[in-house]
Amino acid sequence: IISILNYLKTNTMKKLLLVLLFISSTVSCSPDEETLTTTTEPIFPIYLDSNGITIKAYDFALVGNEYELNGVSYTVVDDSTIDAQIANANVNLCTTFVNNMSELFKDNSSFNSDINFWDTSSVTTMNSIFENATAFNQDIGNWDTSSVTDMAGMFYEASSFNQDIGNWNTSSVTDMVGMFYEASSFNQDIGSWDTSKVTSMERMFWAAEAFNQDLSGWCVSNISSEPAGFATSSTLPNFIKPVWGTCP
């Protein structure tokens, strides 16, 4: 009997020891395994937006710094630095911090570079940005114009421009005076623009010789009658003009 008890005692202790060793090894390995498999990806100051086109910056990106993305260097700019970069013919810019793009390319008759990747989500004024930029005819249909209030003179005498901007968000715009004044090539469908906040459209299509798109669906409840020179010397017929004072 004593021999049997000793046998049971010895084997039970062995089994208990094996169980304790297994638990101990499992606990001690877990932190190491977690350390090896858990990593934190670094956040780069600039990045490609989900649309696959726009270059954007995080808040911690430094104005004036250059950052490389997909093999291209982009300079981060704001309102106080963008003009100098344009003057130096640098358009590889990250414009997330820019609010004012007024007259950026005014009278630059040779400018015709791709800037569709610019982040314009914070821009509030584009007044005369392409005024007399007679060579410019690049796709900028991707621009986020949802914050823009002033588009006056935007394509004033931009005689080559004829790109699709029909999907622009113009819901915040109040001023479109002279927007396509003598933009002699422009003839794109912009009939779906939200013009419900626009209060000024004088000379908007003055001498826009090619333009004859249907604008009868525009909401122009803030403008009671046809503004002076709205479509003077253009080919826009009366029956497809906005119905002034109404919001269809």
Features from the language model and the residues they span:
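Negatively charged
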Residues: P31-P248
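Residue-level signal for mature regions of secreted extracellular proteins and peptides
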Residues: F22-I23, I240
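C-terminal motif of bacterial Sec signal peptides marking the signal peptidase cleavage site
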Residues: S25-S28
